[in-house]
Amino acid sequence: MKEKGFWEGAQAAMPTALGYVSIGLACGIIGAPYVTPIEMGLMSLFVYAGSAQFAMLALIAVQAPVAAIAMTVFLINLRLFLLSLHASTYFRHTSLWQNIGMSSLLTDETYGVLMGELAHTDKVNPMWMHGNNLNSYVAWFVGTVVGTALGGLLPNPEIFGLDFALVGMFIGIFASQFQIMQRRIPVRNLLKILAVVTVSFFLLLTVVSQSLAVLFATLLGCTMGVLLDGQ
């Protein structure tokens, strides 16, 4: 059987790419009052993180200090370090630069596409992974830049509810992930983790900002998950 290459990887990423274009348009339209299309393009090229870019735009809107923006992006994207570590185990014999290239463009969705491919095969060609990553990368870049250009033509983009686009996407992801987790993790443990996140969030709101409360509550929830797992 012929080994799958770059174009097969790009084809496998088409559902992700289409989703990135739509979410990218929403991100660009929302960010239009605060950044130019060129600035948004540079943000997408060098940051390339949907949730982090939405957070950046929210912080830019309130004129938050650069240090706060950088720390927020770092914490939001920290999970990608773990995803890259795991993905690299399937490319042990690939060169360092190839692995750096794959890890630099890895996202939650392209990682999911990789895991889906590995469910049907034991080995993935690095070029397949580059196709998977690059198709999604270009789609996000195009979506955000076009969205920013269009946003400048809309007097009040909030009326379209586009600011809820990423939230809606994550609700869908969480719902599907919750169903999968139920098969491996007892429901009572999931409820304990949710309780820790909820209670700690409202307690933290009394001493820190909302954005920091979300981040710290998430870290506490992760800690609770590790303790309950016992590993």
Write out the residue ranges for each language-model feature.
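Helix-loop-helix hairpins and the membrane-proximal interhelical loops
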Residues: 1-49, 56-73
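Membrane-embedded alpha-helical modules
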Residues: 126-216, 223, 227
